Structures are given as structure tokens and as C-alpha cells.
Amino acid sequence: MYNAPPPQDMSYYEHCQKRHEEKGCLYACIFTALCCFCCYETCECCLDCLCCCCN
């Protein structure tokens, strides 16, 4: 028999959505902004999360 595949990590967007559900919109937006600050660039995924985290 085959073993089950290893669990997959959450995508960045899913991680932001989880933060939004657990801690609220403000926390999710700050979390997303700090990610861009730490990697010194603004990626498209970060912008999508910032624009949509309060929806």
C-alpha cells in the first residue's frame, strides 16, 4: 500500500485569511504589511491580501 502524501503548507493568502478569522482585520493587515517590510519588497500577493483582508 502507498503512504499518504505529506501535509502541504498553507499558502500565504490562506495564512492571512486565518489571521483575519482568528484575530480580526487590523491584525491581518498589520501582519501582511510587516511581511512586505521584512522582505523589503511589495509582492503582488501582499497587495491582494491588504486589499482584501477586510472583506
Curated annotation (Swiss-Prot):
Give GO MF terms, alphabetically.
Answer: metal ion binding; metal ion sequestering activity
Bilayer topology: Single-pass membrane protein
- Where mainly located? membrane
The record's section on Pfam families has:
CYSTM
Q: Which GO terms describe its cellular component?
A: extracellular region; plasma membrane
Where does the sequence pass through the membrane? 24-40
A GO BP term here is: response to metal ion
Q: Which UniProt keywords apply?
A: Cell membrane, Cell wall, Membrane, Metal-binding, Secreted, Stress response, Transmembrane, Transmembrane helix
Q: What family does the database annotate?
A: Belongs to the CYSTM1 family.
State the protein's purpose.
Answer: Confers resistance to heavy metal ions (e.g. cadmium (CdCl(2)) and copper (CuCl(2))) by chelating them at the plasma membrane of root cells, thus stopping their entry and reducing their accumulation.
Q: What is this protein called?
A: Protein CADMIUM TOLERANCE 1
Q: Origin organism of this chain? A: Digitaria ciliaris
